[in-house]
Amino acid sequence: MNIKTLTVSEVTNYIKRMLDNDFILSNLSVKGEISNLKYHSSGHIYFTLKDSSGRINCVMFKSNAVLLDFPLEEGMEVIIKGRASIYPATGSFQLYCDEIRKEGLGDLFIKFEKLKEKLSKEGYFDEAYKKELPKYPQRIGIVTSPTGAAIRDIINVSTRRSSLVDVVLYPAKVQGSGAYKDIISGINYFNRKKSVDIIIVGRGGGSIEELWNFNEEELAKAIFNSKIPIISAVGHEIDFTICDFVADVRAATPSQGAEIAVPLSDNIKDRLLDISKNLDKYISDRLDTCRNNLSGAQRILKVHSPMAKISNSYLEVDRLQDRLNFAMRTKIKGEKNKVENLNNLLFAHNPIKVISKGYAIIKDNENNIITSKEQLNEDKNIEVILKDGNIEGKFIPSK
């Protein structure tokens, strides 16, 4: 039996025609849980529809996506109306969705919501417990896979932003059973060593199953108990994990985590320049204040110094001595004037001066001055004092 050899395109086109013409596959209603959700920039939506034992890739083109009245979410249980076909360029089987309606929440999403509610009630998400990131870290610890895109993105962004910050990697599994224990070990390692200023925990995007290790309660508590601030940088912007809520800062992607953690070199230089200027001004102001205080102290010291007091005492002694000399001169002059006045008065009443004018003083033999004839008896001895000498005689009354 001869079998015709077909090209790849012939095979894929044949299968596509078979599927497109199949009554059941061309008008399907399928129930499942959304996983690996991606909103494309073109407006198309790509995701995987899964249940406990199977999965199908799905696409909803923009023309139908704009009619959705709710946003699709990881773990959401939905019913899809559409058709099954293959994409000839890749030969991949997929569902082309015309309509999507909510059916309920998947098991993982329900588990996620329950843990989120539990931890929220216990205070693990409270802003009061969020640690502030240091503005100018020197070393940043990274807990992620050493071979994934996340570490490459973090290193590239960090290097571009600043050469002053060191990046230290703790290699950890970020996917698969028990990977969260590796991540916890990395957090504990950096806390034990105290060798970094910030920790970034992260990985690239993925389905809810692939990111599930970042929804484990043990990891959430390890992040909460870390003494070092932690940035959660898990998945893409639309991906949210428990780690995002409990971490001190949430970054939409690993690259954004590096941008948050690492300051630009220019900003650091500008900050250092500002600090230098402020320090110069502070030192200059302090020196001016010290100079003014020193000048004031010198003035006070000059006024209250012992030498100043001695100098003032010398001046006071000189002043008092001048006053004393003046008082003595004034007193002496006054006394001289008194003596001179008394002398003049004495001279004016001097008997010699009276005698010199032609008068005489008569004394009896008992040296009494005779001022009246009644004091004399006949033949009584007398002494007459004249200007140029004394004369003795006897008193003879006139007849």
UniProtKB/Swiss-Prot annotation:
Classification via Pfam families: Exonuc_VII_L, tRNA_anti_2
One Gene Ontology molecular-function label: nucleic acid binding
Keyword list, A-Z: Cytoplasm, Exonuclease, Hydrolase, Nuclease
Source organism, top-level taxon: Bacteria
GO BP term, example: DNA catabolic process
Family listed: Belongs to the XseA family.
The keyword Transferase belongs to this UniProt entry's keyword annotation: no
UniProt catalytic activity: Exonucleolytic cleavage in either 5'- to 3'- or 3'- to 5'-direction to yield nucleoside 5'-phosphates
Subunit structure: Heterooligomer composed of large and small subunits.
InterPro entries xrefs: Exonuc_VII_L (IPR003753), Exonuc_VII_lsu_C (IPR020579), OB-fold_nuc-bd_dom (IPR025824)
Functional description taken from the UniProt entry: Bidirectionally degrades single-stranded DNA into large acid-insoluble oligonucleotides, which are then degraded further into small acid-soluble oligonucleotides.
Any single Gene Ontology cellular-component annotation: exodeoxyribonuclease VII complex
Disulfide bonds: none
Record-linked PANTHER family: EXODEOXYRIBONUCLEASE 7 LARGE SUBUNIT
Subcellular location as annotated: Cytoplasm
CDD domains assigned to the protein according to its UniProt record, in alphabetical order: ExoVII_LU_OBF
Protein name as it appears in the record: Exodeoxyribonuclease 7 large subunit
EC number, as in UniProt: 3.1.11.6
